[in-house]
């Protein structure tokens, strides 16, 4: 139990990648809402994003706790539509997990797979709309209005 608690405490204190803040700043400056949609619980999300200093750029921290199932269940992705009262195709979903981007794409979101490690595209029933090596892609895309890394 002590090891589990120690690991969870470390997870709550993870530093954000250096490109996270500039990407969220770009979204904010563009007048767009930004949210996190996570399999984590609400308490963990609140603590982790406060510790990373990013909550001032996030409109919502959405947890699967609200629906009682985990991604890739479509009810989880529906949380984003319900929160912002938009259609799925109006949401741009960014994930560092290929399976998560694939499931979000099947749900109807436009997707970016943030693939820092340069992993090969997995054989999944859907592929991301964009593949980017970092979150800098978001800042660049919002400032130029074009995408340079098409999948």
Task: Spell out what each predicted region is.
Residues 2-36, 46, 74:
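Short, acidic loop-to-helix structural element flanking the phosphoryl-transfer center
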């Amino acid at each position: 139990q002590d090891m589990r608690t120690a690991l969870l405490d470390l997870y709550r204190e993870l530093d954000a990648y250096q490109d996270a803040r500039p990407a969220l700043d770009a979204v904010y400056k563009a007048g767009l809402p930004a949210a996190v949609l996570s399999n984590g619980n609400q308490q963990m999300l609140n603590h982790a994003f406060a510790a990373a200093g990013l909550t001032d750029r996030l409109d919502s921290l959405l947890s699967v706790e609200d629906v009682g199932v985990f991604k890739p269940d479509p009810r989880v992705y529906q949380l984003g539509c319900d929160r912002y009262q938009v259609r799925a195709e109006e949401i741009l979903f960014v994930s560092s997990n290929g399976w998560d981007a694939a499931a979000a794409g099947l749900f109807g979101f436009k997707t970016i797979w943030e693939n820092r490690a340069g992993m090969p595209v997995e054989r999944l029933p859907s592929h991301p709309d964009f593949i980017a090596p970092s979150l800098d892609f978001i800042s660049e895309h919002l400032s130029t209005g074009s995408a340079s890394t098409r999948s």
